[in-house]
Amino acid sequence: MIEVSEDIVLYPLSVDDIFKIFNTLNNEREYMREWLPFVDATKEAEDTENYVRYVLQTADKQFTIYYKDQFVGLIGFKDTDSDNKKTEIGYWLSQYAQGKGIMIQSVAKLIEHAFGELDMNRIQIKVAVGNDKSRRIPEKLGFQM
């Protein structure tokens, strides 16, 4: 568990999260499909289960984001290269939870975790062209764009 603030907590991804993740994606499918290419391929909870089980077998740590004890999204490392001490951070947040500073605080805390606990030297964040809300996060955190 990584405590981000009094209201925001990151929990390691587990199989117990499958239905929360699927239900959020399914309920917000129209909104999320614009930026998350996997949404249309996620048709059943089994698709989410396959993803979660795959991630749990990799070196890429992923976390659920809880805001005021409610699941609101995912954040985690992707394409981690421990030998060269570099990783990428990816994230998504439920539409209703946006605009509250949840993601920028979560990304900042995950960066701190990557440099401090995981001994990373380089972190990348890739953002879809046109996704200005997502782009503002690495910009505000001082990433080179």
At which residue positions do the language-model features occur?
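Short loop/turn motifs at secondary-structure junctions and domain boundaries
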Residues: 53-59
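Conserved GNAT-fold acetyl-CoA-binding loop/helix
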Residues: 31-53
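Acyl-donor (CoA/ACP) binding surface of acyl/acetyltransferases
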Residues: 1-20, 24-31, 62-145
